[in-house]
């Protein structure tokens, strides 16, 4: 005997020993094709190991489950509505056989009963393709644990099973459960709706309470995985003890509840997510009320989100805001009246077609218990009943197709389970304006709703405040919620408040939601999309202030014409240019006079021309540096200035030689005069300066560079040289040496004839140049900010003025105002007087 045969043999034995008689017309309706219904009319949360006693539990001994009876009536209503519909299954009567499964305690016996023949036998066969069971399909049960138990049996026979409220993601596995479908979205969508609700209200610090069964464990784990990817942290997770509402708690169970509520009180989290069957929560909420834990937001899973009995604990309104995830509300016309009429609403009780029957088909108190909650059930929009209603219609449409029905008749024939299953997978119809079809996982994509519990009798007790659409995986239509807070403010549930813009997170503890907020320093920014825990440095050409999320381009700073310092220096340069040009004209008109010739003659025109060129180079300091302007700054201007200073130095040396060294070294002086010593010296100095300039340009380059202003980092200074101070020292080193030489020779000639004594003027010019250059280098060694360029230009213009006015100015003064001293006779008399004094 193979494994399959052994399984069937075991099922036959169980069926034979477990069957007991019971009968109630509310549970049975004869018909051409029977549907099996599994509903929790009573609830035993702990279960019973009843197989050890070979005895089926008596469900009527347990707590009545109002919603379960309501769902059973939805199945009865759907069957009777279909039987009265001439367009669907014309000429065919659907029947049903309904069993109370006591939540999880009574699942095996009913499914064996549904699978057996009328004689309660399950024959051993190699092939069950042609096997005919008592029912053609099973609707239910209501929870995932029971559904898996039942599906393991029904899948062996490919007998269609449609559950209306089991949400476990395990049920999507069609290899394990090929005959299982459901008319409710899976746990994946329920959890996603919860998470999107938390994200919408910025709740990232939550508490999770789960029941100790598979439902609580699986959904708690799924929520933990989902929130971890959304930066939502679980402060703690606790398992609630499994308790019956009418059951006395043990001391351990009571202490367990006290401990859990104590942790709720001490936690800073104010959002509590509860995955638990409804009946296990009565003792828990009584303890919450006893300890007066208020101000929380309670998020209910679908198992208790619309439970009317739990809602009847009106004191819960003081605990905070209750939100629940449940199936969308689809009103079914006529159902409320059908439920209120009870069994009498259906057709008269009929005799069974055979003497086969099963147990747990009685519920004496169900109708009265349901009627006591009739108002709340009606106002709540009859939620979930549509899932049962649509499941029955899905089977009916599949039968309609399988039997080849037309508008008036159907071909009644034997229906095998696997044939009906194939047709159910294909159904696609509209029921009360909703499209019903099964996706590849066997689910119907009905919308979910977020409901808020209300205790105002004039309102819907489960008021819809948002909708979740499984196909788009989006939470939409979020409405205003009546928060049980001061001024109706949205409750806060965050371990740490959100950091402000430009603040990085510093983790505190093990939870990513707990952190300190630290400002990003200037020059750094926070990129939330890349790293919220580290501030990134700005690129070199950008800057940021403290606490920024982006950098901005640094302000490029250079001399501009509209600035006051630039205008002032430009006016000085213009004054120097005009005065130098005037001096050139004066010297040209008095070229043959002794003063001009004693000042250097042709050499004066070279100096004045170079000074004019230097003044004309001043504008290249203004505006953004370019290669051409940098070339003028680093080559043309230094060269012009060096030649001018070298002329002064050579002229000083020449005068000293003529009066003091010619008599002592006549031969050397004759060579100096014969071989044009002054011009050779100037040419040598010029070549040396050109070498220095070329070396400097090769070392630093001509391309403009930028550097950050140390006093204001948001400013970038554009200059021609990346190492401005060293370049200035290198470029002016020869000029400083020449100024010292010129000053020395001028000082040596202080006793020369008055007309040749230029010590005062050369000393003034060279001393000013030397002092200003040293001061500029000192200033630049201590400061490298935006003022360097303007100070450098100012010193340059002042040095040019010192030569133009300090050296040539006195000579022009003598030419213009003392013409009698600009004669050969006067100069000869001065030389004779100097010679006589020496003798």
UniProtKB/Swiss-Prot annotation:
- Keyword Signal: yes or no? yes
Q: What terms describe the molecular function in GO for this protein?
A: G protein-coupled receptor activity; sweet taste receptor activity; taste receptor activity
Where does this protein reside within or beyond the cell? Answer: Cell membrane
Q: Name one Pfam family in it.
A: NCD3G
- Biological process per Gene Ontology, one example term: sensory perception of sweet taste
Entry-linked InterPro entries: ANF_lig-bd_rcpt, GPCR_3, GPCR_3_9-Cys_dom, GPCR_3_9-Cys_sf, GPCR_3_C, GPCR_3_Ca_sens_rcpt-rel, GPCR_3_CS, Peripla_BP_I
SUPFAM superfamilies noted in UniProt: Periplasmic binding protein-like I
Q: Which residues are glycosylated?
A: 84, 248, 292, 312, 368, 428, 487, 527
Q: How does it sit in the membrane?
A: Multi-pass membrane protein
**Membrane side Extracellular: which residues?**
20-566, 624-635, 703-727, 782-784
Signal peptide, first to last residue: 1-19
The primary location reported for this protein is membrane
Keywords attached to this Swiss-Prot or TrEMBL record, sorted alphabetically, are: Cell membrane, G-protein coupled receptor, Glycoprotein, Membrane, Receptor, Sensory transduction, Signal, Taste, Transducer, Transmembrane, Transmembrane helix
Q: Which GO terms describe its cellular component?
A: membrane; plasma membrane; receptor complex; sweet taste receptor complex
Q: Which residues are on the Cytoplasmic side of the membrane?
A: 588-602, 657-681, 749-760, 806-839
What subunit structure does UniProt give?
Forms heterodimers with TAS1R3.
Functional note = Putative taste receptor. TAS1R2/TAS1R3 recognizes diverse natural and synthetic sweeteners.
Q: Which family does this protein fall into?
A: Belongs to the G-protein coupled receptor 3 family. TAS1R subfamily.
Q: What is this protein called?
A: Taste receptor type 1 member 2
What's the source species' lineage?
A: Eukaryota, Metazoa, Chordata, Craniata, Vertebrata
């Amino acid at each position: 005997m193979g494994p399959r045969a052994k399984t069937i043999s075991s099922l036959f034995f169980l069926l034979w020993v477990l069957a007991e008689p019971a009968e109630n017309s509310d549970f049975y309706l004869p018909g051409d094709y029977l549907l099996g219904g599994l509903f929790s009319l009573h609830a035993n949360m702990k279960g019973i190991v009843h197989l050890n006693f070979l005895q089926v539990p008596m469900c009527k001994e347990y707590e009545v489950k109002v919603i379960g009876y309501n769902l059973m009536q939805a199945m009865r209503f759907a069957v009777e509505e279909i039987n009265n519909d001439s367009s669907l299954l014309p000429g065919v009567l659907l029947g049903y056989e309904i069993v109370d499964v006591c939540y999880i305690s009574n699942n095996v016996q009913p499914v064996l009963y549904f699978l057996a023949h009328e004689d309660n036998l399950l024959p051993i066969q190699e092939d069950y393709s042609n096997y005919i069971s008592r029912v053609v399909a099973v609707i239910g049960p209501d929870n995932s644990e029971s559904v898996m138990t039942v599906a393991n049996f029904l899948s062996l026979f490919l007998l269609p099973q449609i559950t209306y409220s089991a949400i476990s993601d395990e049920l999507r596995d069609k290899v394990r459960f090929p005959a299982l479908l459901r008319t409710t979205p899976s746990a994946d969508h329920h959890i996603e709706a919860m998470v999107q609700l938390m994200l919408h209200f910025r709740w990232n610090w939550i508490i999770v309470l789960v029941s100790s069964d598979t439902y609580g464990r699986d959904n708690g784990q799924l929520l933990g995985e989902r929130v971890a990817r959304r930066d939502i942290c679980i402060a703690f997770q606790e398992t609630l003890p499994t308790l019956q509402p009418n059951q006395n708690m043990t001391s351990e169970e009571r202490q367990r509840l006290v401990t859990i509520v104590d942790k709720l009180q001490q936690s800073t989290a104010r959002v509590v997510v509860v995955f638990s069957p409804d009946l296990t929560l009565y003792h828990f909420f009584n303890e919450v009320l006893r300890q007066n834990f208020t101000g929380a937001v309670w998020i209910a899973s679908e198992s208790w989100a619309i439970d009317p009995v739990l809602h009847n604990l009106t004191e819960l309104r003081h605990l905070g805001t209750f939100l629940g995830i449940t199936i969308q509300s689809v009103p079914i016309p006529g159902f409320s009246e059908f439920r209120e009429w009870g069994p009498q609403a259906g057709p008269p009780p009929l005799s069974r077609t055979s003497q086969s029957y099963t147990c747990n088909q009685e519920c004496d108190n169900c109708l009265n218990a349901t009627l006591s909650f009739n108002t709340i059930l009606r106002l709540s929009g009859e939620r979930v009943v549509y899932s049962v209603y649509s499941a029955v219609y899905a089977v009916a449409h599949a039968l309609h197709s399988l039997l080849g029905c037309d508008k008036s008749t159907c071909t009644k024939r034997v229906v095998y389970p696997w044939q009906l299953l194939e047709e159910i997978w294909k159904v696609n119809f509209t029921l009360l304006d909703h499209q019903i079809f099964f996706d590849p996982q066997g689910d119907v994509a009905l919308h979910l709703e977020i409901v808020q519990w209300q205790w105002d009798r004039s309102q819907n007790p489960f008021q819809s405040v948002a909708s979740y659409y499984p196909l788009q995986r989006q939470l939409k239509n979020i409405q205003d919620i009546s928060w049980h807070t001061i001024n109706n403010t949205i409750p806060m549930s965050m371990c740490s408040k959100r950091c402000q813009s430009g603040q990085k997170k510093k983790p505190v503890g093990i939870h990513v939601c707990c952190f300190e907020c630290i400002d990003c320093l200037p020059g750094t920014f926070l990129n939330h999309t890349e790293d919220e825990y580290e501030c990134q440095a700005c690129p070199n050409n950008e800057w940021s202030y403290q606490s920024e999320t982006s950098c901005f381009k640094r302000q490029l700073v250079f001399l501009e014409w509209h600035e006051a310092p630039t205008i002032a220096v430009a006016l000085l340069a213009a004054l120097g240019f005009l005065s130098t040009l005037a001096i050139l004209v004066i010297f040209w008109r008095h070229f043959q006079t002794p003063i001009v010739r004693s000042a250097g003659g042709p050499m004066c025109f070279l100096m004045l021309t170079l000074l004019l060129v230097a003044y004309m180079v001043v504008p290249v300091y203004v505006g953004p540096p370019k290669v051409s302007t940098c070339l003028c700054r680093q080559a043309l201007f230094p060269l012009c200035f060096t030649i001018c200073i070298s002329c002064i130095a050579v002229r000083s040396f020449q005068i000293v030689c003529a009066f003091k060294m010619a008599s002592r070294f006549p031969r050397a002086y004759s060579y100096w005069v014969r071989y044009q010593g002054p011009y050779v010296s100037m040419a040598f100095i010029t070549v040396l300066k050109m070498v220095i300039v070329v070396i400097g340009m090769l070392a630093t380059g001509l391309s403009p560079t930028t550097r950050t202003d140390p006093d204001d980092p948001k400013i970038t200074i554009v200059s021609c040289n990346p190492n401005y101070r060293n370049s200035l020292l290198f470029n002016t080193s020869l000029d400083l040496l020449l100024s010292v030489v010129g000053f020395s020779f001028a000082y040596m000639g202080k006793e020369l004839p008055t007309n040749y004594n230029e010590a005062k003027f050369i000393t003034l010019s060279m001393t000013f140049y030397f002092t200003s250059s040293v001061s500029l280098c000192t200033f630049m060694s201590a400061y490298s900010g935006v003022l360097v360029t303007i100070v450098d230009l100012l010193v340059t213009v002042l040095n040019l003025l010192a030569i133009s006015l300090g050296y040539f100015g006195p000579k022009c003064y003598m030419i213009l105002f003392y013409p009698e001293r600009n004669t050969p006779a006067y100069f000869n008399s001065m030389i004779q007087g100097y010679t006589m004094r020496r003798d």
